C-alpha cells in the first residue's frame, strides 16, 4: 500500500484483504506512470477498463443429425433433464411461455419451478425496453432451456424455439441495467452462484471489445483450474479473424457461428481467431444465423409466447452449451 502511495496511487483497506487463489483487483484512476506501477511488488498486470457488449447480430435438429425433420437425441432421452445451465446476460422475460410455470402463472422461482432455479436481479429486474441489448438475454436463455409451457403441460416435446436441452433448468444472472453492461468485477461471483445451484455449464455471450488476455479471461481460466468439472462457453464476437476476450482463455470453450443448414458453413462474420498468443481460436461451430428463440416484450405479466430471430456468436454459444 505504501509503495502505491509513493507513485501517486491510493488504495485503502489492503491490510484487510483475505487470502484468495484469485488475484485481488483494484480499479484506480490512471496513474502518473504505468512503468512505475508495474514495478510495484505484487502487481501482476495492468489493463484498461473497457465497455462490455453483447455478441449477437430449427438449430437443435441440425445439431443432432443434420436433418431438420428429426430430433434423434430426444428419442434417446438426451434432453437436458437433471442438468442445470447458467447464463449471465441482459435479463430474462420470465413470464414468456418458454419459462413460466403454467399458461397463466409465472410461478415462484426456485427448486419447485419447472425452469428457473435462480433469477439474480440484484443489479436489474428483467429484460427491459430502453436498456442496452434489450431482448438479448431472453433470446439466449430460450436457446439454452426453452420448453414451451403448452407443450410441457400436454407432455409434448417442444415444437418451437431452438434448444436441445428442453429438460434442463436455468440459473439466470441479470448483468445489464440502465447504465449498460455491468458484469461483476470478479466473474467468479457468477460462477460461484451457478455452482451452488448444482450448475456445471455456464454460457456467456458478451465481453469487452479487445483481443487482449484480460483480467476477466484469467478469472475464467483460474476457475476452470480450481473447479475442473465446470465449463464456460463464451461467444468470441462477430469480427472475423479477431477473437475477443474472454473467449481467448485457455480453459474456456469459444463457439463460432455457422449457417443453419444440413451442410453448414462458417458464418462470414464469426470470429475465429487465433488468439494474440497464436493459440487456437474457436473450439467448435454451432448454428448462429437466423436463430429463432424467445422474444421479450418488456411487460412483466403479459404471458407472451412470441419468438424472434437473431444472428451471431451470441446465438451459437447457448446452442452449443445446451448440446
Please place each PLM-identified region on the residue numbering:
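A cross-family glycoside hydrolase active-site/sugar-binding cleft signature
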Residues: 49, 173-174, 203-207, 233-237, ...
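Sec-exported extracytoplasmic/periplasmic mature domains
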Residues: 9, 39-42, 92, 145-149, ...
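Catalytic metal-binding/acid-base residues of hydrolase active sites
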Residues: 91-93, 207-209, 236-241, 260-261, ...
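Subtilisin-like serine protease catalytic core
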Residues: 72-120, 124-184, 197-200, 210-213, ...
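Autoinhibitory propeptides
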Residues: 3-84
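Short acidic, glycine-rich surface-loop motifs adjacent to enzyme active sites
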Residues: 170, 191-217, 234-236
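Catalytic-core environment of secreted peptidases
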Residues: 123, 259-318
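Extracytoplasmic/secreted envelope proteins and their assembly/folding machinery
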Residues: 31-34, 40, 137, 141, ...
Amino acid at each position: 500500500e505504501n509503495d502505491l502511495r509513493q507513485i501517486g496511487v491510493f488504495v485503502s483497506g489492503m491490510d484487510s484483504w483475505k487470502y484468495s487463489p484469485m488475484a485481488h483487483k483494484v480499479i484506480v484512476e490512471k496513474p502518473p506512470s504505468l512503468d512505475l506501477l508495474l514495478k510495484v511488488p505484487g502487481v501482476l498486470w495492468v489493463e484498461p477498463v473497457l465497455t462490455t457488449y453483447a455478441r449477437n447480430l430449427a438449430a437443435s435438429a441440425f445439431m443432432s443429425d443434420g436433418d431438420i425433420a428429426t430430433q434423434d437425441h430426444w428419442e434417446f432421452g438426451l434432453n437436458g433433464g437433471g442438468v442445470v445451465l447458467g447464463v449471465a446476460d441482459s435479463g430474462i422475460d420470465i413470464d414468456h411461455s418458454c419459462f413460466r410455470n403454467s399458461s397463466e402463472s409465472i410461478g415462484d422461482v426456485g427448486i419447485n419451478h419447472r425452469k428457473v432455479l435462480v433469477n439474480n436481479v440484484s443489479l436489474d429486474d428483467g429484460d427491459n425496453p430502453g436498456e442496452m441489448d434489450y431482448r438479448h438475454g431472453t433470446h439466449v436463455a430460450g436457446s439454452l432451456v426453452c420448453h414451451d409451457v403448452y407443450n410441457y403441460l400436454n407432455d409434448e416435446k417442444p415444437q418451437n424455439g431452438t434448444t436441445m436441452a428442453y429438460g434442463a433448468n436455468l440459473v439466470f444472472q441479470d448483468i445489464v441495467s440502465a447504465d449498460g453492461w455491468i458484469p461483476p468485477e470478479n466473474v467468479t461471483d457468477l460462477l460461484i452462484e451457478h455452482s451452488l445451484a448444482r450448475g456445471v455449464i455456464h454460457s456467456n455471450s458478451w465481453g469487452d471489445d479487445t483481443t487482449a488476455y484480460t483480467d476477466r479471461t484469467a478469472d475464467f481460466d483460474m476457475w476452470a483450474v480450481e473447479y475442473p468439472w465446470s465449463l464456460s462457453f463464451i461467444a468470441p464476437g462477430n469480427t472475423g479473424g479477431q477473437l475477443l476476450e474472454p473467449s481467448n482463455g485457455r480453459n474456456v470453450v469459444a463457439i463460432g457461428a455457422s449457417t443453419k443448414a444440413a451442410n453448414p458453413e462458417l458464418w462470414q462474420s464469426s470470429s475465429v481467431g487465433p488468439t494474440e498468443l497464436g493459440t487456437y481460436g474457436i473450439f467448435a461451430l454451432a448454428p448462429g444465423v437466423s436463430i429463432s428463440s424467445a422474444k421479450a416484450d418488456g411487460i412483466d405479466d403479459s404471458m407472451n409466447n412470441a419468438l424472434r430471430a437473431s444472428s451471431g456468436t451470441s446465438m451459437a454459444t447457448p446452442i452449443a452449451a445446451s448440446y
